[in-house]
């Protein structure tokens, strides 16, 4: 049975990169002040490092192990509009990767935030020129939306108290 006193995941909606960064900065401040609880398993530092890693992949290239097999790509491309506009579902794993994803290093929240901020500023300035390994070619707006939906998913597990 679930703990009724455990923090509940928050539903977030970011319209801009600046909105997402403002929320991350608020969470880092709450964490520093000892006012941050988790609805999920990841610390804030791990969460921000993970978000930074995936934003950096879009800009610098994806490792082979995160490329989806063809049948999965076909399904995900059919779901692209729904994911980009409505959000991501918690609990999805990337293939057979340990931990279900990559970018899971534990880092101080300030370090994760600095990396993510740098990557998001690059993304804001120009669109990635590579294909996304799951969704294929994306417009600049779609790349931004994808990163915002990813941030909503993970930052929703960080609960200021």
Where do the model's predicted regions map?
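Short, exposed beta-strand "edge-strand" segments with a Pro/Gly-rich flavor and a Y/T-containing core
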Residues: 6-15, 37-41, 103-106, 131-138
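Short, helix-capping/interhelical loops that line the mouth of catalytic, cofactor-
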Residues: 2-9, 60-115, 120-123
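Short, contiguous alpha-helical
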Residues: 32-84, 125, 129-161
């Amino acid at each position: 049975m679930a703990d009724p006193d455990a923090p509940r995941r928050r539903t977030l909606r970011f319209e801009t990169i600046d909105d997402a960064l403002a929320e991350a900065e608020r969470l880092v401040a709450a964490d520093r002040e000892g006012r941050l609880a988790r609805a999920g398993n990841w610390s804030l530092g791990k969460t921000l490092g993970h978000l930074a890693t995936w934003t950096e992949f879009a800009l610098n290239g994806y490792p082979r192990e995160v490329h989806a097999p063809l049948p999965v790509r076909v399904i995900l491309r059919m779901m692209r509009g729904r994911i980009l506009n409505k959000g991501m579902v918690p609990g999805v794993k990337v293939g057979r990767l340990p931990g279900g994803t990559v970018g899971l290093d534990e880092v101080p929240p300030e370090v994760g935030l600095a990396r993510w901020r740098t990557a998001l500023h690059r993304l804001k300035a120009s669109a990635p020129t590579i294909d996304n390994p799951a969704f294929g070619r994306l417009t600049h707006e779609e790349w931004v939306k994808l990163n915002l939906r990813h941030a909503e998913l993970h930052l929703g597990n960080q609960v200021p108290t």
